[in-house]
A protein has these predicted regions:
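ABC ATPase NBD coupling module
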Residues: 15, 19, 57, 69-83, ...
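Helix-to-loop junction immediately C-terminal to a conserved catalytic motif
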Residues: 53
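Conserved ABC transporter NBD signature motif
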Residues: 61-69, 229-231
């Protein structure tokens, strides 16, 4: 499903501010893999997701999604088959548009543009059904501006929008980090439910090591632009936070 072959990315090359964010990183995800990604600040986690999504083209290597080499594809072309949720609840939605309008845009992502304006009643019923599963009462607020929603409501809506068309790959970049603990748990529970139900291949960055262990079927740790630890199955289930802290200490030489 996802095959990354020796990708490298350097920022400000040849200057005093040169930063090697990715160093020949290789990674393969099978169909339906739910991989949690941990690592310290500057480990290359967000750069990896930005490379996959096309925000930052890689300097070397190849990125293959569902058998197609997308290394040279621009970001807008990859958006047709990728879903992404960012850390900031303000990203991923149009604040001045209504909930139903945001859902309509997500549903039409990648489709040929037409001159037709408006949302059919049959679509509204579909949107209500989708929103009910969030348990946030948004099904009764279809015309409400998204900018008026709370951070948790907006992030849950963004997650729903990112998965409406069952993306080839779902990228979650610390998507609960800006939420309070109660809301974060609700969004994480919803994430696990949607990923399992749709059998989505998923990469989820998190700084919460407990969540990294509990969620998904596989865990990778990054350090200085590469994967230094990759664990799955029963071995992952049996991990403790102390185990991961020890791995961090080993990597940083402490």
């Amino acid at each position: 499903m996802l095959e990354i072959k020796s990708i490298s990315k350097t920022f400000n090359a040849g200057t005093v501010n040169e930063k090697k964010a990715l160093r020949g990183l290789s990674l393969t995800l099978n169909d339906g893999d739910f991989v949690t990604v941990i690592g310290g600040n500057g480990a290359g986690k967000s750069t990896l997701l930005n490379a996959i999504s096309g925000v930052w083209p890689v300097d070397e290597g190849h990125i293959i999604i569902d058998g197609k080499d997308v290394t040279k594809l621009p970001e807008y072309r990859r958006a047709a088959f990728l879903g992404r949720v960012f850390q900031d609840p303000m990203n991923g939605t149009a604040a001045t548009m209504g909930i139903e309008e945001n859902l309509a845009l997500a549903l039409r992502r990648g489709a040929r543009r037409t001159l037709r304006i408006g949302i059919r009643n049959s679509e509204r019923e579909l949107y209500r059904d989708w929103l009910k599963r969030l348990g946030l009462g948004l099904e009764d607020r279809l015309t409400s501006k998204v900018g008026l929603l709370s951070g948790g409501q907006r992030q849950a809506l963004t997650l729903l929008m990112a998965t409406l068309q069952r993306p080839k790959l779902l990228l979650l970049d610390e998507h609960t980090a800006a939420l309070d603990p109660k809301t974060a748990k609700k969004v994480l529970d919803l994430t696990a439910e949607i990923v399992e139900e749709q059998h989505l291949t998923t990469l989820m960055i998190t700084h919460n090591m407990k969540d990294a262990i509990q969620l998904g079927n596989r865990l990778i740790m990054m350090h200085e632009g590469n994967v230094i630890y990759d664990v799955a199955g029963e071995k992952k289930k049996n991990l403790t936070v102390e185990d991961l802290l020890h791995k961090f200490e080993e990597a940083s030489g402490e």
